[in-house]
Design a protein with these regions (language model features):
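Aliphatic-rich helix starts adjacent to a transmembrane/signal segment
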Residues: 2-69
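Residue-level preference for alpha-helix termini and adjacent loops
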Residues: 9, 39, 45-48, 69, ...
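Short linear sequence signals and composition-biased patches located at protein termini or domain-edge surfaces
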Residues: 44, 48, 52-58, 62-67, ...
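C-terminal globular interaction/adhesion domains in large, modular proteins
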Residues: 80-143, 152-154
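Short loop/turn segments at connectors of secondary-structure elements within structured domains
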Residues: 145-147, 204
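Short polybasic amphipathic segments
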Residues: 147-155, 179
Length: 251
């Protein structure tokens, strides 16, 4: 009759080895989870940046390309529809801007709506009656630390409405023809608002070149990490917007 061997427990060394292996696996799991959270956060930040850039450029393009629009061209002309008023020192002028001041340039766009024609203002509203719309885009400080700004729009001199946050700079150039001896209306220069004012080119602006700069959502996440890639603090996006009333496209 065989003798039954007595049961033995784990020795202290075996327990310590098991605990060490468990801690190693747990550490790997926590590192994986932390990495996934960082990745998801970075992807979310990039998606938000793309949405902000797309929305900002769409709002700016919808308004700027409508500059100079007026209904019933058989009755009105640009000169009669948009007389001298405020910053518009020339009859028929539909664009005006400022440059050089922090945190960025500003642009003011004027056009008319006939009512129920689907023409929108910078806040996305349409109108049921004929209205003159003066839209001013600029950056406004949000009062945060560190200081951040938002793209805002003021309609007909009213209080500015915040459109997009996270914008750090707005640079605007205006496409004009400065060579008066050549034929046609081809753009030969992109000038700042100051240069356009000095040359008296506002009535002949055919396009607008926008550069919007946003805070880079990946900049903070890359600090303290060893990487061969330099992560910029900001990201800039550029777009050229044609003024349809000037380039022969019906609005």
């Amino acid at each position: 009759m065989s003798r039954r061997r007595p049961q033995r427990g784990f020795t202290l060394i075996e327990l310590m080895i098991a605990m060490l292996i468990g801690l190693f696996l747990l550490g790997g799991l926590l590192t994986l989870v932390a990495g996934m959270r960082t990745t998801f956060g970075m992807q979310g930040g990039l998606a938000q940046l793309q949405d902000s850039e797309r929305l900002a450029m769409t709002l700016l393009a919808d308004v700027i390309q409508t500059a100079g629009y007026y209904p019933t061209p058989t009755v009105n002309t640009a000169v009669t529809a948009m007389p001298v008023s405020g910053v518009y020192t020339t009859a028929g002028q539909s664009l005006y801007g400022t440059a050089g001041a922090a945190p960025g340039d500003s642009i003011t766009v004027r056009y008319l709506t006939a009512g129920n024609d689907g023409v929108i203002d910078c806040t996305g509203n349409t109108y049921t009656v004929a209205t003159t719309l003066v839209n001013t885009f600029q950056l406004t400080a949000l009062g945060t630390t560190p200081q951040t700004y938002a793209l805002t729009c003021s309609l007909n001199g009213a209080t500015a409405v915040q459109l997009i946050s996270g914008v750090t700079n707005l640079q605007i150039l205006y496409g004009v023809k400065t060579n008066t001896t050549s034929s046609g209306d081809s753009i030969d220069s992109y000038l700042t608002a100051t240069q356009v004012t000095a040359g008296g080119y506002w009535p002949s602006v055919n396009s607008v070149l926008l550069t919007l700069t946003f805070t880079n959502p990946l900049y903070g996440t890359a600090q303290g990490q060893t990487t061969s890639v330099n992560v910029p603090q900001t990201l800039s996006f550029t777009r050229v917007i044609g003024v349809m009333a000037k380039i022969g496209v019906a609005t």
